[in-house]
Regions:
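Non-catalytic, mostly N-terminal accessory regions of nucleic-acid modification and defense proteins
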Residues: 1-214, 218-219, 281-290, 403-406, ...
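A conserved structural/catalytic subdomain of Rossmann-like adenosyl-cofactor enzymes
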Residues: 2-5, 304-456
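Helical mechanochemical/support elements of P-loop NTPase systems and associated helical scaffolds
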Residues: 10, 14, 29-33, 159, ...
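Glycine- and acidic
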Residues: 21-23, 172, 196-202, 251-256, ...
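Generic recognition of flexible, low-complexity loop/linker segments
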Residues: 23, 273, 292-300, 358-359, ...
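Flexible interhelical turns and helix-capping residues at alpha-helix boundaries
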Residues: 26-29, 223, 249, 363
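A generic secondary-structure signal for well-formed alpha-helical elements
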Residues: 44-50, 54, 194, 223, ...
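Conserved S-adenosyl-L-methionine
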Residues: 201-312, 317-328, 373-376, 384-398
Length: 456
């Protein structure tokens, strides 16, 4: 395990170095920093993944002292033969796309243009597989021009050189060879600075890894005969809930479907899917408003698609007065009603009640689901909340509820609970678990938080 630790430490050092570079060039905590960090890290990951895989299919490259040089000397036909032999979840890279090639061109004055064109060319070449899309079917490419975020034109080439300098110190190939499973932890570390409050409608409601794991374990249980499973999150954020579910089921046994209105979340979700060997699900990761324009539909395009497992950690309160009437015009979907627009404090509109209804509507007849809700929902005596409660209890859909510790979520001090649904409606009793006192307190900046320990 010492080797794993060494690679993991080097990976964390790489992330810290990339963040330091952004800081040096005036983009520390800038709104564009996350784009640079996530895309450059992903470029490094895919470059090394490509190198690892091409050496498995080409003896020439495997035995070469410098495989990048040997690859560059091959003919175009040889490259095409290699591409045909690669698994479908491996990106196709030309010699000029490799980190080694960029390293050798750093002395050129227009290196920022070379760097940017390399990134966009890789994205264009792999657009069919390595892209997500909007609800209007616009492809969202893998990479974009990154040096444009440096305001000073004269600093762009040095910035690009500084980024590439950080990418050549080690390779992920050893991690691939030994099947080390630490990229889920690396993703958590990579995005930890960007899961803060603010920034976007349905802002990035990050789910702590421990809670995601608990939800996945309780949903899937000890089921072993799982295959062709479809999992969905209508408020996916960065995908933590879906990744935990896929890991429990088996990444090779399930397909992920996701939607979130946030552009930032979609970029991070893309990275999360790739790091977790779920490239085939990228096409199902949609950026768009789930409530007014749900993307995932049945084959006839009229009804909502239904899934084996549905999970969600939606925003609880939010001003959606601009779209409220459009939502209310869909009474079949929102059968329990839609919260009214208050005269004051529109930001306190209970948008989570709409996501509960959407989750229930998205379950197969034998499907299971789980959703994070404010604990106050459980004792609601009126309004939309009461109608939903009455429905899930009377119809025997809800089978469990866990009250979580306060301050367990980074962005809210609201007490939260997790509801568990089983649409087969076989359960007569609801299991209530009080986990509010579990876990340990820790300091998160100026805030006192609580995190759960791993428990069954």
């Amino acid at each position: 395990m010492e080797e794993t630790k060494t690679i993991k430490e080097k990976t964390i050092e790489l992330i810290d170095a990339l963040k330091a570079t952004c800081q040096t060039y005036g983009m520390g905590n800038d709104g564009n920093e996350y784009k640079i960090i996530t895309q450059v890290f992903l470029y490094k990951f895919l470059n090394d993944k490509f190198g690892y895989e091409v050496k498995k299919v080409s003896p020439v490259l495997k035995n070469a002292e410098k495989w990048e040089l040997a690859y560059a000397e091959m003919s175009e036909d040889d490259h095409l033969d290699i591409f045909d032999s690669l698994p479908s979840d491996i990106p196709l890279l030309n010699p000029e796309h490799l980190i080694a090639n960029l390293w050798n061109q750093q002395a050129k004055g227009d290196f920022d243009l070379i760097f940017d064109s390399t990134m966009t060319d890789i994205a264009d070449k792999n657009i069919d597989i390595f892209s997500t899309q909007t609800a209007q079917n616009t492809k969202i490419p893998l990479f974009e021009k990154l040096t444009q975020y440096v305001t000073d034109d004269t600093a762009r080439a040095p910035f690009a050189r500084a980024l590439v300098d950080k990418l050549v110190n080690f390779s992920f190939e050893e991690a691939f060879e030994k099947h080390y499973d630490f990229f889920a932890d690396i993703f958590e570390y990579l995005i930890k600075d960007y899961n803060t409050a603010g920034g976007g409608k349905y802002a990035e409601y990050y789910t702590p890894h421990a809670i995601a794991t608990i939800m996945a374990r309780l949903l899937v249980g000890n089921a072993t005969d799982l295959h062709s499973i479809e999992c969905y999150d209508p408020s996916a954020g960065t995908g933590t809930l879906l990744m935990a579910l896929a890991h429990k089921i088996g990444e090779d046994k399930c397909t992920i479907f996701a939607q979130d209105i946030s552009q930032r979340s979609n970029k991070m979700l893309k990275l999360n899917l790739i790091l977790n060997s779920l490239v085939s699900s990228l096409d199902h990761a949609i950026q768009g408003d789930t409530l007014i324009a749900p993307y995932h539909k049945s084959d006839n395009g009229q009804e909502l698609r239904t899934f084996d497992y549905v999970v969600s950690n939606p925003p609880f309160k939010m001003d959606f007065s601009d779209t409220r009437e459009r939502i209310a015009a869909m009474p079949v979907r929102f059968w329990a009603g839609v919260p009214k627009v208050p005269a004051k404090k529109k930001e306190r509109m209970a948008i989570y009640t709409l996501f509960i209804q959407h989750v229930l509507n998205s379950l197969k007849s034998t499907g299971k689901g789980a959703i994070v809700v404010p604990t106050g929902f459980i004792t609601a005596k009126s309004g939309v909340e009461k109608k939903i409660l009455q429905h899930i209890v009377d119809e025997h859909i809800v089978y469990g509820c866990i009250s979580m510790p306060s301050n367990v979520f980074a962005n809210t001090g609201t007490n939260v609970s997790v509801l568990f649904f089983d649409n087969s409606r076989k359960t007569d009793k609801v299991v209530l678990i009080d986990a509010s006192k579990l876990g340990e307190e820790y300091k998160d900046g100026n805030n006192q938080k609580r995190r759960l320990r791993d428990f069954e």
